[in-house]
């Protein structure tokens, strides 16, 4: 992935000391990262790397990765030569096997599909919050979809963020920068009276 094991664990510990949470990212849950933070956000992306319900049940929040600012509208590709034994274990792959993420969820397409999955998350966890991560592109339409799917929170990923899997042309030129995107998102949430969504 984009971050080393040591970096992910250090960020988890630092976030805990700061009183905030940490997110698994699309690559799956590193056990030591989760164990060192009491506010762990578990993310499921289109590749569903390493997904299991027992991992969801160890988390304090869960969200769908519907988009990413650095590579909006695309999937991901971690070349096989970067898939070490540890990455393979976390992602449910074989060492050396490329990690390919499709551009969208093959089995979740409608808001009702996501809502059903979200209900299962809440049922299995005693009601942890379920959210959506979206790229800052079609902000209002994506918020409408997330709200219809029953999101408790929305993560808005603006232009300028980075990831090892993002082409420079997308990372540097596509999407709305985060601060203006937040203003648009807040205005739209107020307009549709989605006060329950953070």
Features from the language model and the residues they span:
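N-terminal capping/small domains of soluble enzymes
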Residues: 1-102, 113
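Glycine-rich phosphate/ribose-binding loops and adjacent secondary-structure elements
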Residues: 105-198
